[in-house]
Each structure stands twice: as structure tokens, then as C-alpha cells.
Amino acid sequence: MKPVGEADVKGYNTWDTSAPIDASTPDVGTRGEPSLDAIVALHPDLVVTTTDLPENVIKQIAKKVPVLALRGSDGSDPIGYMRRTVTTLAKATGTEAKGTQVLADFDAKVDAAKADLEKAGKTGAPFTMADGWIDNGTVSVRMYTPGSFLGGIAEELGLKNQWTTGGDKDYGLATTDVEGLTKITDADTTFLYAASDDDGGDPFAVGLKDNKVWKQLPFVSAGNVKRIPDGIWMFGGPLSAERYVDAVVDALS
């Protein structure tokens, strides 16, 4: 189903190539500050947003057009919540059969990946997932706990997340720095991370290349740092999940 409008079309297509939006799709502003006038001008049947958008903004939009506001994720059950969200959106758009098929495809992908990991001797393998950014020369690191979308997918694959604490209640994300990574002591841990050459660059390969603490981390010394392909949205749905599954299998096997 093609949207009549989208917030931050360019940014979306930078970070999510699993389900790209037509670049000519009308842009209605940023995700945090959408333009009410731009939205209304498109005469949408339904506006879908997350409850991350301020409540007063959602109410303003709802005065003009129907709005479906969904929680971005649920740190207590990220994959279950993804499933429920797909079902909710399918019902709202009259595409129930498609929604069922999308979830079935995801399940099949997970089953195949678990078999591939077993063949590679990687069932239950230790891993972490991260992204990061550079601010005034300092690298901040965001860790994906089991309550995160990507952490939940890896758990479905039977992998063992080595960063289990500090996640927020919605997205399961925890923030640390390079010194904090010293808590990861198992050299067999695969340190997966996301970055974008088009938005922020690579804080690990570039920002930490000369950092002594980073270079002495067991998993770094062992060569177990793997960047996942660009364009896998870290807070997405089944299509992003399937691409992440492929990325994990490739990285570990």
C-alpha cells in the first residue's frame, strides 16, 4: 500500500531500504514536527503515527483527519508487539490476508536461519548489537538489549545477548561509552553494529580506530566486529526483520 504522504522521506529512505518509499512521495515534515497543513492538504483516509509524537500534536491532527496512534515498540515483548502491530495495520487498511502472509514469511525466515546457524555451530552464540554517534570527538554507544527490536529477533534465532541491562521500556535501548564496553568479556562475542555512510558515518571504524580501550577489547582483538548492511531499519517491521536475520547469519557463519 503506497502512502499519499510521509514524514522525512529522505531520512526514511536513508535508514530503511527494506521497504523503500517512492522519493517523489510528498514530505509532510519531520517525524517530531509534522506539518498539519501539509497532512490535511493530502486528504488522507488515515494518518498512522506513534505515541512518540507529542499528545497535543496528535490531537491537532485528529481534529482534521482520522488518526491511528500506536506505541513505537514494547520492551517487554518486542517481537510479539511487532506481530500485533502488523495485524492492527492490516485490519485498519483492509489488507488482512497480506498481513498474515507477511508474518508467515517472517516465521519461515527465522526457521531457516536457525537451521543455518545450527549447521555453522552457532546456536546459542554470544553477540551484541549496537549503533553510535560522534559528538565533539566523543563516541557514544547505544546498545540493543533483549527488549529491543533487533535484540528480540536475535533471541528468536537462539543467540545470547551479552548486553541485557539498562534498556528503556519502549525500545529496549541502553546508552554507554567505549569504557562501558569492557563489560563484554567473552572474546567469542560477535559485536554487530549499524551505521550509515549517508547520515553520521561510521563511529566505530572511524571514531574508535585509534582508541586504545576499543582496540584492547577481547571481541575487537579477536576480529569479531561486524557492521550490518546499510538500510536495515532498527525499529522496523517484518521486512526489516528478515534483512536483519540474513545479516546476522552472514556475520556469524
Language model: regions and residue ranges:
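A short, structured surface patch at a secondary-structure boundary
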Residues: 1-38, 51
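Hydrophobic beta-strand scaffold residues
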Residues: 3, 67-68, 161
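Alpha-helical, coiled-coil/dimerization segments enriched in small aliphatic residues
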Residues: 10, 140-173
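Extracytoplasmic ligand-binding site segments that recognize negatively charged/polar headgroups
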Residues: 11-14, 54-56, 72-88, 122-152, ...
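Short helix-initiation/N-cap motifs at beta->coil->alpha
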Residues: 28-36, 168-178
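Proline-aspartate-enriched helix->loop->beta-strand connector
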Residues: 43-49, 181, 186-190
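Extracytoplasmic substrate-binding proteins
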Residues: 66-136, 231, 235, 239-253
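Structured C-terminal subdomain patch of bacterial secreted/periplasmic proteins
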Residues: 185-253
